[in-house]
Amino acid sequence: MTMSVRFRIAALSTSLLLSSLATAASAEERCSNASLVGSYAFQVDGANISAPLPGGPGPFAAVGRNTYDGKGGMQGTIVISSNGVIINATYAGTYSVDADCTGVKSATLNVGATVDFSFVIDDDLREIRMIVSDPGFAVSGSARKLSTDAKSKE
């Protein structure tokens, strides 16, 4: 091979390597508040160890629907079972998503409680895995984007 051909092969190899590194970096840092838009159905369960909720300490489970605005705001409805006591509530709150698709959110329920979560978004932004990050809970769960949501079809 001539020097010119070797140089071209080396330049092409370097170019391919750099473009694949850039693609990998952008894939790792692809999330922001705008990544969460639309409605998600969620479920969480675990234990209320010492949080001040009706029913007191004991098993804890909840299901609901959360709607994100893509700008750091959210609202939703939730049905909670706290040690067998059923609580129907609505909430509003805020969230923040980091570039690595991890985040935090805080929901203030109309029954006087505020619950904080840490989460990660996966499955091409369609699924969320979360834990309650407040003391007094050992609760985890997941949320799935609703395909019937008009915004999810855009």
PLM regions and their residue ranges:
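Bacterial N-terminal signal peptides
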Residues: 11-20
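Bacterial N-terminal signal peptides that target proteins for export
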Residues: 2-12
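Mature soluble binding/inhibitory domains
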Residues: 24-154
